[in-house]
Design a protein with these regions (language model features):
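Transmembrane alpha-helix/helix-exit interface in multi-pass inner-membrane proteins
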Residues: 30-48
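Membrane-interface interhelical connector segments
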Residues: 45-59
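Interfacial segments of alpha-helical transmembrane regions
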Residues: 6-36
Length: 150
């Protein structure tokens, strides 16, 4: 969490009002991906891997919500997609962000909370939410912050 707060403060300091809207759109990407992923869970009632006795021993707590899709994957891929598009001039950044989101998502498989398909579904939802948030940010930027160097 401190990483995200420090990053947000750096964006605010560097880009001022445009940075504030960037943060608003990033938060919107997370909210949309999280809610969309939660919505899908109500239709696909897949139990978590930790619901079986063999896996339950690997995690301290097995959530009572359904498994497909992974909210962790959706949220982190939403941020990765959004920031990759916003800072597309930084050529190495998308690789770092996708690897970071991938590690977060795969950790959910490692601890027995999700199946690989759960994180793939979450990643898809997240990338779509990230693109949608970027489209909104682009409209706001073009209308109000055309001179900004983002």
């Amino acid at each position: 969490m401190p990483f995200y707060i420090i990053g947000g403060l750096m964006v605010l300091y560097r880009y001022r009002w445009a940075g504030l809207w960037m943060i608003v759109c990033a938060v919107l990407a997370i909210v949309v991906s999280d809610q969309s992923s939660g919505f899908v869970k109500h239709f696909i009632h897949r139990l978590r891997p930790c619901a079986t006795e063999q896996v339950r021993l690997l995690v301290a707590h097995c959530s009572d919500t359904f498994s497909f899709t992974s909210n962790h994957a959706a949220n982190h891929f939403a941020i990765a997609a959004f920031l990759s598009l916003v800072f597309r001039r930084v050529k190495w950044l998308p690789y770092v962000l996708i690897i970071w989101a991938g590690f977060v998502a795969l950790s959910q498989v490692y601890v027995g909370l999700h199946f690989p398909a759960d994180i793939a579904g979450g990643a898809l939802i997240g990338v779509l939410a990230g693109y949608a948030a970027f489209a909104l940010f682009k409209l706001i930027k073009e209308k109000y912050f055309a001179e900004s160097n983002i």
